[in-house]
Amino acid sequence: MSTDLRTHVLSEHHVSRETAASLDLYVAQLTRWQTVKNLVGPATLKEVWHRHIADALQLLTVAPEATRWLDLGSGAGIPGLILALAGKERPGFHVGLVESNARKCAFLSETARLTGAPVTVHNARIEAVIGTLTDTEIVCARALAPLSQLLAWTEPLLTSGTIGLFPKGRDAATELTEAEDEWTFTRDLIPSRTDSQARIVRVTSLSRVDP
């Protein structure tokens, strides 16, 4: 891990000393659990501050006022657990983490306990719990599914005022075109701060295309 890269990420996102300590603990936990549970791509662990932490933190710059977040398919806690650590000093900040894999949920729960992250871990399939989480302001998911599937899962939220933030790679335009065959929505493509070819797809006002 590059100390210079860590310092750059913390400075760019104005991370407090206390939050930096929590993120360091998260990285230590991720490294320890990676040896027994493949939480992230092994090559990306060497670039964790850029590939994962900075990539997650940039979502806060897109929705700086939001305090009620939901992360689908949380896995290693990216971006949800990282967002919770960055926001835990803010009153009322909370992130729901939805993950169907029990061992990944064990990682999320233990790391949240050690870091004091303001999260609720939902060990369940998305479709089983999404309808009960309608107080969500922002729903996000990274590297989980094509956009059309994400919209299908989040329909109960995005039709009721919740904003979707979905980081996508170079296929973002293709996924948007495919999604527009089934859905009508307002969208913005926000350039990623960590990958010049990636975009954050911001979705609001979702409805199904009339048959």
Curated annotation (Swiss-Prot):
Enzyme superclass (EC): transferase
The UniProt annotation places S-adenosyl-L-methionine binding at 73, 126-127, 142
Spell out the Gene3D superfamilies in the cross-references.
Answer: Vaccinia Virus protein VP39
Report the domain of life of the source organism.
Bacteria
Keywords from UniProt, A to Z, are:
Cytoplasm, Methyltransferase, rRNA processing, S-adenosyl-L-methionine, Transferase
Q: Where in the cell is it found?
A: Cytoplasm
Q: Which GO terms describe its molecular function?
A: rRNA (guanine-N7-)-methyltransferase activity
Q: Give me the reactions it catalyses.
A: guanosine(527) in 16S rRNA + S-adenosyl-L-methionine = N(7)-methylguanosine(527) in 16S rRNA + S-adenosyl-L-homocysteine
GO cellular component terms given for this protein:
cytosol
Q: What EC number(s) does its UniProt record assign? A: 2.1.1.170
- Would I find Methyltransferase among this entry's keywords? yes
Protein family per UniProt: Belongs to the methyltransferase superfamily. RNA methyltransferase RsmG family.
Q: What does this protein do?
A: Specifically methylates the N7 position of guanine in position 527 of 16S rRNA.
Cross-referenced NCBIfam families:
rsmG_gidB
Question: What is the designated name of this protein?
Answer: Ribosomal RNA small subunit methyltransferase G
Q: Which organism is it from?
A: Methylorubrum extorquens (strain PA1)
